[in-house]
Amino acid sequence: VAVPMVDMHTIGAGGGSIAYVDSGGMLQVGPESAGAAPGPACYNQGGKRPTVTDANLLLGRLRPDAFLGGKMPLHESAAYHAMQSVAEPLGLSVEQAAEGVVRIANEHMAHALRVMSVQRGIDPRGLTLVSFGGAGGLHVCALAEALSMQQAMVPVHAGVLSALGMLVAPRSRQLSRTHIARLMNMAHEQIEAVYAELEAKGRQELIAEGVAKAEIEIQRSLDLRYEGQSYYLNLPWNDLKSCEAAFHRLHAERYGHELDLPVELVNLRVGLVSRPTPLTLTSLPAGPASVPYDQVSLYGLEQSAAVYARDGLMAGQQLTGPALITETVSTTYLAPGWYCKVDAAGNLLLSNRV
């Protein structure tokens, strides 16, 4: 389908992903999910099969009294009973089975991260892994370690980050025109004329939605490929020769080689975006470091983990794992060997180096 899309890699490894023992006697996780209804067994809303959420609860990484700010208590007994269905066939304790479920879910997610980075020639080791979603913080340290990454971040409002982004996302239009021809057979004026037509249409639509003409930013790009290929690469529009040279470089960077073939134009694209809505978030005050409100035992760890309320953390405060950081819409598990520093905006900056 020749429409602009966000390049995403989706896997079945959410908090509702169901664990089971397959016909070969192997523990599997996902892609089947319990969803929100009936949900994980620990929701006590009719779900009977073990999920990743149940596993995190049994390992002590989820607080049964802190889920949704304590408004929705989690039932450990229901999670325990559900996890027995995979523990017994494998000859494992319930806690061992829960640990296996989390490890398999982590590996599914780590593999997806490798597909989006290593397999595309991107070395993730110098990057920061950003975690969001209600369960993202429970797995972020393990995923960063799996990719040899030393830094991660759990942004403020992580559990509802997608909804927040939707609310402040700018109005936009993406328009395209298919025109298959050898790039160097096209005239610069011919391409400019198509762009002008697309821009006029998109600008008119945004103005009709109340966007001021002066607030519209325009981005021109084109899809190019080698003649005979079935896939293409998108590049910003400049001029014919510059785009041809840039395509050769990008193809070599993405696929490891370039070809001595004519470059073919496939689509001309225009993106029109209004100025984003200013987002003002409350800054955290600096002050005395808050203290944990509890200590909990986590399966597999000799030392107890401190439990902090995220809304009580101060700017500049530093934490050492193992620790749990709870909030209404998510929980962050700071694994042993990891450190957390709270920035002025309230983001949790994680690192496995001092």
Model-flagged regions — what are they?
Residues A2-V3, I11, G15, A19-D22:
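Conserved P-loop NTPase motor core
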Residues D7:
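Short pre-catalytic strand/loop immediately N-terminal to key active-site residues, enriched for Gly-Thr
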Residues P4, R125:
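Short beta-strand or tight-loop elements
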Residues N44:
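Nucleotide/phosphate-binding site architecture used for ATP/NTP-dependent chemistry
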Residues G14, S23-G24, V29, A34-P38, ...:
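C-terminal, non-catalytic interaction/recognition modules in large multi-subunit enzymes and RNPs
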